[in-house]
């Protein structure tokens, strides 16, 4: 499970840290907008006029309002992931 979150956590953390507005699309088609206040393994707290707890299993897509640099890996980590993908 840690392998699956090696991309998700840095991405969500960059959105939270830089306070980038996001659109979150749910699996039922509803669009939520706001800023990511916090997140854990199961939920995202989305803040707009109120804070909403959104369960990750209900999320289809997270769309940032602008480009985000989320590659905060240790040196060599990206190369290791590419090597595994090619094998």
UniProtKB/Swiss-Prot annotation:
InterPro entries, per the entry: Hfq, LSM_dom_sf, Sm
Start and end residues of each Sm domain: 9-68
Domain of life of the source: Bacteria
Entry's family note: Belongs to the Hfq family.
Quaternary structure, from the entry: Homohexamer.
Stated role: RNA chaperone that binds small regulatory RNA (sRNAs) and mRNAs to facilitate mRNA translational regulation in response to envelope stress, environmental stress and changes in metabolite concentrations. Also binds with high specificity to tRNAs.
Full protein name: RNA-binding protein Hfq
Organism: Aeromonas hydrophila subsp. hydrophila (strain ATCC 7966 / DSM 30187 / BCRC 13018 / CCUG 14551 / JCM 1027 / KCTC 2358 / NCIMB 9240 / NCTC 8049)
